[in-house]
């Protein structure tokens, strides 16, 4: 009798989803064993596929932005969030880049961090019990920017203290980054021109019909 049950993440498991005309890649994971999820991926205007290596379920790790090398079938590091945000070991980690990878007109990649994993000494991820704590909490999501031309990344700071950004979208018309807050359910707007943050509205359908958000808690 044929066996239709395969071990999760085995070679047979991955082969099940192949379709005609679809190329499936399984690049090697050396150096990324602690990551167990991906919550965003986007193709840049030049055709490069960027995605986030994320941590949840007690891995206690900071996220990576990586890109896929099609010709070599390998994952290439762009930045490790832990190198950019100067984290405290007792804080909740910046474990994800969650639905926030965007591309600026000059080719740079901009994304925001989000936390859905526990600190190493916590027994469980309890964001609403910890995020406001000075030593045990979450200082806030960071805006991180990667320049593929130079290979350098930089931290633009925390737009909203004690808030975790659940998603972000760049608006080229107004040169703004719109962000949805996980803790408070608000929409925020960051101007790349003035470097100022403005609270737009409580998370909901905006009257203009231009900004939408969805938070599941």
Write out the residue ranges for each language-model feature.
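Repeated scaffold domains used in trafficking and secretory/extracellular systems
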Residues: 36-40, 87-101, 163-169, 208-217
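Short, conserved, GDST-rich strand-edge loop motifs in beta-rich repeat architectures
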Residues: 54-62, 111-138
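Surface loop/turn motifs at the tips and blade-to-blade linkers of beta-strand repeat domains
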Residues: 28-33, 79-82, 89-93, 156-161, ...
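Blade-loop segments of beta-propeller domains
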Residues: 37-38, 63-64, 73-106, 114-116
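Beta-propeller blade signature
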Residues: 64-73, 129-148, 189
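Residue-level detector of Asp-centered blade-edge/turn motifs that repeat once per structural unit
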Residues: 43-46, 103-106, 171-174
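A short helix->beta-strand "capping" segment at the edge of beta-propeller domains
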Residues: 1-34
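Beta-strand-rich domains and repeat architectures in extracellular enzymes and scaffolds
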Residues: 25-63
């Amino acid at each position: 009798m044929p066996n239709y049950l395969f071990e999760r993440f085995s070679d047979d498991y991955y082969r099940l989803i192949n379709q005609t005309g679809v190329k499936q890649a399984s690049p090697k994971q050396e150096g990324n064993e602690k990551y167990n999820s991906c919550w965003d991926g986007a193709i840049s205007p030049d055709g490069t596929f960027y995605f986030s290596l994320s941590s949840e379920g007690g891995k206690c790790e900071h996220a990576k932005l990586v890109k896929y090398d099609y010709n070599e079938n390998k994952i290439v590091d762009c930045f490790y969030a832990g190198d950019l945000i100067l984290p405290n070991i007792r804080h909740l980690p910046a474990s994800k880049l969650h639905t926030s990878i965007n591309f600026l007109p000059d080719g740079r990649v901009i994304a925001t961090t989000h936390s859905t994993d526990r600190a190493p000494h916590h027994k469980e991820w309890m964001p609403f019990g910890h995020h406001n704590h000075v030593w045990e909490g979450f200082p806030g999501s960071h805006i991180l920017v990667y320049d593929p031309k130079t290979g350098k990344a930089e931290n633009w700071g925390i737009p909203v203290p004690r808030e975790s950004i659940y998603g972000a979208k760049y608006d080229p018309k107004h040169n703004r980054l719109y962000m949805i807050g996980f803790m408070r359910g608000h929409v925020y707007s960051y101007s790349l021109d003035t470097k100022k943050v403005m609270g737009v509205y409580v998370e909901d359908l905006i009257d203009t019909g231009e900004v939408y958000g969805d938070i599941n808690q």
